[in-house]
Design a protein with these regions (language model features):
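Active-site-proximal alpha-helix that buttresses catalytic centers in soluble enzyme cores
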Residues: 1-127
Length: 127
C-alpha cells in the first residue's frame, strides 16, 4: 500500500474483549467495506483487551502514507467510551500527527440506517 493508493482511511473502533470470537463481526464489517470499496483502506482498532489499539492502528496507516483518517465508533450508543475515552485518545493522536486530518463519526448505533436495520432484523426473528 502506498500513499497514492490510500491517502484516506477509515478505522472501525470497537471496545474489545478477551474472547477472540468477539472481534469477528467487526472484522466482517471491515471486510465487507473493503469489498464494497476496494479503493478505501479500512482498519480495525480496539479500546482495550484486543489488539491493535487505536494508536498502533493510526501509526500503521500513517506509515503507508495515509493523511486523513475517519474513525467510526462501532458502539450502539454513546456511553462513556464514545463520549470520554475516544475523544481523549483522539486529542493525543491529533497532537502526535499534526499532518493528518482526523474525523470522528457518530457512534454507528445512532445512525438511522443502523437502527432501521436492527429493527428489521429483530422483526425478522419474530415468530
Amino acid at each position: 500500500m502506498t500513499a497514492m493508493n490510500y491517502p484516506h482511511a477509515i478505522i472501525l473502533f470497537a471496545h474489545g474483549s478477551r474472547d477472540a470470537l468477539w472481534r469477528r463481526p467487526i472484522e466482517a464489517v471491515a471486510n465487507d467495506m473493503k469489498q464494497l470499496s476496494p479503493a478505501t483502506q479500512v482498519a480495525c482498532a480496539y479500546l482495550e483487551l484486543t489488539e491493535p489499539d487505536l494508536p498502533t492502528t493510526v501509526a500503521g496507516l500513517v506509515q503507508t502514507g495515509v493523511n486523513a483518517i475517519r474513525i467510526v465508533p462501532m458502539f450502539l450508543g454513546v456511553g462513556r467510551h464514545a463520549r470520554e475515552d475516544l475523544p481523549l485518545l483522539l486529542q493525543d493522536l491529533i497532537i502526535q500527527y499534526p499532518g493528518v486530518t482526523f474525523e470522528l463519526s457518530h457512534a454507528i448505533g445512532e445512525e438511522p440506517e443502523m437502527t432501521r436495520a436492527m429493527a428489521a432484523i429483530a422483526l425478522k426473528s419474530n415468530p
